[in-house]
Amino acid sequence: MIIDTPEVQDINSFSRLEYLKEVYGIIWMLVPIFTPVLGITIGVLAIVWLEREISAGIQQRIGPEYAGPLGILQALADGTKLLFKENLLPSRGDTRLFSIGPSIAVISILLSYLIIPFGSNLVLSDLNIGVFLWIAISSIAPIGLLMSGYGSNNKYSFLGGLRAAAQSISYEIPLTLCVLSISLLSNSSSTVDIVEAQSKYGFWGWNLWRQPIGFIVFLISSLAECERLPFDLPEAEEELVAGYQTEYSGIKFGLFYVASYLNLLVSSLFVTVLYLGGWDLSIPYIFVPEFFEINKAGEVFGTTIGIFITLAKTYLFLFIPITTRWTLPRLRMDQLLNLGWKFLLPISLGNLLLTTSSQLLSL
């Protein structure tokens, strides 16, 4: 059988179309994966630059200014430098625990981004147990730090890992009780439902005004969970060299560096979602596209504005932990544990009882 030239061309074009369809299918599968990763990376770089600029202003010195415009690429330059440094392993340590520890710390924090809503329809996983899943996932990170400290075969590293575990346990309970109070107020543990419950009453419906005591306890507990000054005892330079990070170098040291800022960003995002109304601004911006007769863009416009509002609230709140790091002295270990067990735990329990009583009386 003889096949004409046009038929051969049609067959070739059809095969090329099938190949292109497969390529586009793979690309569209990868887009939802790489988009959050890119967003998180840019967010961390912005936090590092913001902290360096604020700390420079507090200390009356010049911040980074050579790597990129206004020094915004300095963190990227530091990360690139760490990539090319030698990865050292302790000769007498447990190399498996030493290598796995940083990965556990980073992955447990990255998983928390699954339940953070940037809009009513823009959340990777809207679960009924969203906020408690975050607490459960964040409890895994200290295990990685303890593994790193033990696997290093270094007394300073091991002591830093023990401090990280003790600090996490002490402040995880008040944090959980504050989240439980928010869940009772909103009648849901879903992060999307919590934001929508606040948006019903506008600006004065934010949980910041309905739960001021819980907000303060949550703020202090989240700072302790992030190991930020004045709660950075697991890596206190004057006492433990660098804590559980002492024996690390290269990319593994960089993972701890990234995990610290990832945790700070997650905590700030959850403060925005739980207490500051999330993507809600109490201004009817959704009617702007209708005013300009571009109704088809209304949903896209609303989603874009929601992302912008959430990030704006988050980065404005970041001024608090950044400022406290460069203005407050470090606590002693006994002071840190006393604050968690003797003050924050009873206060958070009392706040939970008040919230429960008010909810029962309102039935």
Curated annotation (Swiss-Prot):
> What is the main EC category here?
translocase
Signal peptide feature range: none
Q: Name one Pfam family in it.
A: NADHdh
Membrane topology category: Multi-pass membrane protein
Task: Could you list this entry's UniProt keywords, alphabetically sorted.
Answer: Chloroplast, Membrane, NAD, NADP, Plastid, Plastoquinone, Quinone, Thylakoid, Translocase, Transmembrane, Transmembrane helix
Provide GO CC annotations from the record.
chloroplast thylakoid membrane
Q: What superkingdom heads the lineage?
A: Eukaryota
Protein's cellular compartments: Plastid, Chloroplast thylakoid membrane
Name the GO terms of the biological process aspect.
aerobic respiration; photosynthesis, light reaction
Q: What parts of the sequence cross the membrane?
A: 30-50, 98-118, 129-149, 248-268, 300-320, 336-356
Reaction(s) the record says it catalyses: a plastoquinone + NADH + (n+1) H(+)(in) = a plastoquinol + NAD(+) + n H(+)(out); a plastoquinone + NADPH + (n+1) H(+)(in) = a plastoquinol + NADP(+) + n H(+)(out)
GO MF terms here are: oxidoreductase activity, acting on NAD(P)H, quinone or similar compound as acceptor; quinone binding
Keyword NAD found:
yes
Quaternary structure annotation from Swiss-Prot or TrEMBL: NDH is composed of at least 16 different subunits, 5 of which are encoded in the nucleus.
Q: Report the family membership.
A: Belongs to the complex I subunit 1 family.
What's this protein's name? NAD(P)H-quinone oxidoreductase subunit 1, chloroplastic
Q: Which gene encodes it?
A: ndhA
